[in-house]
């Protein structure tokens, strides 16, 4: 695992966040990516719905580069997904008329997220996107990277 301000973060760093969601009854699937880079397996989510046939509403999400890859995947799978969660990430793909529910969050003190790019690419999200700026939050705040 590299430090919190670089890519290639182990997927298990996001387990505590997903655990909190799971405690609320939300099925969360944490996918291991080759070399801890979502860009190396852009279709990793393809086989997941068939493993959980009882689930009817599917969201995909990710943090940073993983979020950008999730957005790219969502743009190509709008008929199969219900929503997208972007954590310190933005979408370069046009999702404006996708019908997806989108939630985007980042920290007010995020020194890694390219804010100019984030703002410029907000045009790619549906008008009803929900956005949260976490006061005092930083880029690494979405994961548990260890000491």
Language-model segments: which ranges?
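Conserved alpha/beta-hydrolase
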Residues: 18-38
């Amino acid at each position: 695992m590299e430090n919190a301000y670089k890519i290639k973060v182990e997927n298990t760093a996001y387990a505590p966040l997903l655990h909190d969601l799971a405690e609320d009854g939300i099925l969360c699937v944490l996918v291991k990516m080759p070399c801890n880079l979502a860009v190396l397996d852009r279709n990793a989510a393809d086989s997941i719905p068939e493993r959980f046939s009882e689930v009817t509403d599917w969201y995909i999400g990710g943090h940073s580069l993983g979020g950008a890859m999730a957005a790219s995947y969502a743009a190509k799978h709008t008929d199969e997904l219900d929503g997208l969660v972007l954590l310190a990430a933005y979408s370069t793909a046009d999702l404006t008329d996708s019908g997806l529910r989108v939630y985007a969050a980042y920290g007010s003190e995020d020194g890694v997220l390219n804010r100019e790019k984030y703002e410029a690419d907000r045009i790619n999200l549906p008008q009803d996107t929900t956005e949260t700026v976490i006061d005092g939050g930083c880029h690494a705040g979405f994961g548990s990277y260890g000491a």
